[in-house]
Amino acid sequence: DVNLKKSRIEIIEKSNKYLNKKWRFFKCDLLEKLKLSEIFVKYKPEYVINLAAQAGVRYSLDNANEYINSNILGFTNLIECCRHSDIKHLIYASSSSVYGGNINFPFKEDQGVNHPVSLYAATKKSNELMAHTYSELFKIPSTGLRFFTVYGPWGRPDMAPMIFAKNIFSQKPIKVFNNGNLTRDFTYIDDVVETIYRLLSKPATVNYANPMQSEVSDFACPHRIFNVGNGKEVNLLDFINTL
């Protein structure tokens, strides 16, 4: 929802004036490689948080090119800019959808994720592979975050929590599949923000003199993956009743 994004920006701009922070907004498509590169050259960012993507599983079934353009080509342009800049840490959004058809719960970062069941999941897995490769080749410290069903104020209107809430306020019935015998790991937006904030200044480190003492399992590469979730299964009907 473009209007939702514009409203978010207006709130940030008002807060920026009040707090006297040096915050700038640039309207830029990640496919605009030259414009993106000019921003990096001029402002020389030290930290990059990439939350830009074409999201959603169902939409990807009929709109493949939008996912390739945004999540693959756009991500490539961004990480190339990081490569040619003195970036201290790149944090990027992956997704819990990369776990695909895994049936071993709870999901763990060291599980295999080689069988995505949607194009969206495949693009997010690709992001992880690309970030790992750039960390290996160019020593870019990077962290991928696999988010689990994020909800909260200003959330995406196509997500279940917002759809449920809208139907409740409109006094419309809520469509429930599988008789409600579904569970999800719902993650509140404030927890996501806190996670990113805490990780930003703590990139993965590699002890090249003594690689075995490095904090990452792939000790030659400053790249890591974290699950970001509530850590508890919530029954769908319980969630609806809480709303």
Identify what each model region corresponds to:
Residues 154:
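Conserved GTPase G-domain signal focused on the G5
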Residues 34, 73-76, 162, 190, ...:
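Surface-exposed alpha-helical interface segments used for non-catalytic interactions
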Residues 4, 22, 166-243:
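C-terminal substrate-binding subdomain of Rossmann-fold SDR/epimerase-dehydratase oxidoreductases
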Residues 93, 159, 182:
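A conserved catalytic-core signature of glycosyltransferases
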Residues 126, 130, 134, 164, ...:
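Hydrophobic alpha-helix immediately C-terminal to the catalytic Tyr-X-X-X-Lys motif of short-chain
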